[in-house]
Amino acid sequence: MRKKSSTPNRGFRVADQIQRDLTELIARELKDPRVGMVTVQSVEVTPDYAHAKIYFSVLVGDPKECEIALNQAAGFLRNGLFKRLMTHTVPTLHFHFDQTTERAADLNALIAKAVSSRAQDD
């Protein structure tokens, strides 16, 4: 029988702390010109804290270039997390561009198009 974790929300708390610390590290210490104004949208940590998927959005600049730059700076950012987090291990960071906003805009456009065509039919 599997033992229940005494702190079931620990993974969420660690992910939340990583999100806050990464936001600060990227804004203040990362000097790569390819990384513009980045917003860390969410962090997903594996149960063993070995890997973390970081989803981000970019206000200005090319998302693909920014993703490459962030993945190249993952070691530097992980080192910064070592100094800030009070955990035994710090996960390996994997950055992914969050396409949720683009998908939402596309869906809104499709809905608006369907509503306008339905209004013309009536």
Swiss-Prot record:
Organism field: Polaromonas naphthalenivorans (strain CJ2)
InterPro entries found in the cross-reference section: KH_dom-like_a/b, RbfA, RbfA_dom_sf
Entry's Gene Ontology cellular component terms: cytosol
Subcellular location, record wording: Cytoplasm
UniProt xrefs under Pfam families: RBFA
Family: Belongs to the RbfA family.
Keywords (A to Z) from UniProt: Cytoplasm, Ribosome biogenesis
Protein name: Ribosome-binding factor A
PANTHER family per the UniProt record, alphabetical: RIBOSOME-BINDING FACTOR A, CHLOROPLASTIC-RELATED
Assembly description: Monomer. Binds 30S ribosomal subunits, but not 50S ribosomal subunits or 70S ribosomes.
Predominant cellular place of this UniProt entry's protein: cytoplasm
